[in-house]
A protein has these predicted regions:
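Active-site-facing substrate-recognition patch
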Residues: 1-68
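Generic non-transmembrane alpha-helix signal with a bias for helix starts/N-cap capping motifs
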Residues: 8, 81-82, 135, 160
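Conserved PRPP/pyrophosphate-binding segment of the phosphoribosyltransferase/PRPP-pathway fold
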Residues: 47, 51-114
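PRPP/pyrophosphate-binding module of the type I phosphoribosyltransferase fold
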Residues: 103-164
Length: 164
């Protein structure tokens, strides 16, 4: 996982600027993990702010270029990293796929949407990491399709011990 102090601080400033980070100590939020917390980060609203969206995509692209030199595909974790992941893949001129939380029950019953070939190397983009369970599940889905994980990057990471 990538962690650049400058980019982390700038990203937090941007998220605060667009009110993506909410605080409510009196009435804690329930996260997807089931944890209760006085803080909630809604990265989905980044897509509604073109200047912020561009900056965050640039940060992610810079970090991927700096850290991973040999990869074939960008994979976004559904649903929060689909939009940003696709924009980053476009910026890097790489193919994009996304990983569903659950395999489709109809059609081709895919867990991964988009074109890929076996043994391709993948950089995974996650919108937010708290416990890391959705990131781990996404990586396991990619591995089960014979894709190789080069690394994982996120917009926001709580850096809880459980996610490391």
């Amino acid at each position: 996982m990538v962690n650049d102090e400058y980019i982390a601080k700038e990203t937090c400033k941007l998220l605060l600027q667009i009110n993506a980070i909410k605080l409510n100590p009196k009435n804690p939020f329930t996260w997807a993990s089931g944890w209760k917390s006085p803080i909630y980060c809604d990265n989905r609203i980044i897509l509604s702010f073109p200047a912020v969206r561009e900056k965050i995509c640039s940060f992610l692209s810079q970090q991927i270029k700096k850290t991973y030199d040999d990869y074939d595909v960008i994979a976004g974790v559904a649903t929060g990293a689909i939009g940003i992941g696709m924009l980053v893949a476009n910026k890097l001129n790489k193919p994009f796929v996304y990983v569903r939380a659950d395999r489709k029950k109809h059609g081709r019953k895919n867990s991964i949407e988009g074109f890929y070939e076996k043994s391709q190397k993948v950089v995974v983009i996650e919108d937010l990491i708290s416990t890391g369970s959705s990131s781990l599940e996404a990586c396991q889905s990619l591995i089960s399709e014979n894709l190789k994980i080069k690394g994982l990057i996120s917009i926001f990471n709580y850096n809880f011990e459980i996610s490391k």
